[in-house]
């Protein structure tokens, strides 16, 4: 039996909502704008989780690496050519700020593209509401984009609070957003549980001194969730509710 909780904090992408297609589309539209190679769904899974800017950076790194690999092959044959190829890779990375701004500018029109709530999540939220448990969405995505997605898929009173990237508060795995939510709700970190699908979420929970639950249906594998300290692993929203009800309510 765990401590009785008063709040459940949820990550967004890969936890509440499957947003892979929208993330992939926005990135590929961005890369097309710069005549660069886009990402697959698997790459999207791997690259997201630590904020939109990091997603853009990792995609640019993938493109730059093509030039760096070519440069390495030419190092012994033609040093000057190798340096030129290296510079092309550097030029790709120099576009980070501009590419990130472009990504942000087009994301609002794509953010609900093929998005859907994961099985059992809506009923889990309803059950928590019925029990008087606070429901908070804490995401590294910009808050305004998160709100658009949540408004499309969930009832208006599904969440007591939504926190996201505002360029002021450090992102997960820093615990500041989690601790801020606790303060605003008037609870201790031991009275909240973090539910997420990546090490970013689980590390944030650990740094805030709270228990975490890992979502096997999200963007990362079981091993990552286990290594980063998930107390429980769940396959869908129904199992999440059962765990919460049995151990923490």
Segment roles from a protein language model:
Residues 14, 18, 39, 43, ...:
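Residues at secondary-structure transition points
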Residues 27, 121-150:
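Substrate-recognition element of Asp-dependent hydrolases with the DxDx(T/V) motif
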Residues 1-8, 42, 66, 129, ...:
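Asp-based, Mg2+/Mn2+-dependent phosphohydrolase catalytic module
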Residues 19, 23, 55, 95, ...:
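Hydrophobic alpha-helical packing elements
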Residues 58-123, 131:
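Metal-dependent phosphoesterase signature
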Residues 29, 33, 54, 58, ...:
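Solvent-exposed, charged/polar functional surfaces in cytosolic regulatory/catalytic domains
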Residues 24, 28, 45, 49-57, ...:
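An amphipathic alpha-helix signature
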Residues 1-46, 57-60:
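Active-site neighborhood of HAD-like aspartate-dependent phosphohydrolases
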